[in-house]
Curated annotation (Swiss-Prot):
Keyword annotations: Coiled coil
GN (gene name): yonU
Organism in which the protein naturally occurs: Bacillus subtilis (strain 168)
Coiled coil: 1-32
Domain of life per record: Bacteria
Coiled coil listed as a keyword: yes
Protein name: SPbeta prophage-derived uncharacterized protein YonU
Length: 62
């Protein structure tokens, strides 16, 4: 009985370690996604600014 209990604890420990690795992997992916999103937002902002400048120039020309 005691051996089964110890085996169960060891198995749970292994599973918890695997879960921790999965969580760490998810955190790393989240950081990468956040960086990509920031980059995309900056790029979108640039395009919007460029469009605004272009529209203003077109209005001046007309």
């Amino acid at each position: 009985m005691e051996k089964k209990f110890l085996d169960a604890i060891q198995q749970l420990t292994k599973e918890l370690e695997m879960l921790k690795k999965d969580i760490d992997s998810i955190k790393e992916a989240t950081v990468r996604i956040d960086k990509d999103l920031l980059e995309y937002r900056e790029e979108i902002s640039k395009v919007k600014q460029d469009d605004s400048v272009l529209i203003m120039q077109q209005h001046k020309d007309n």
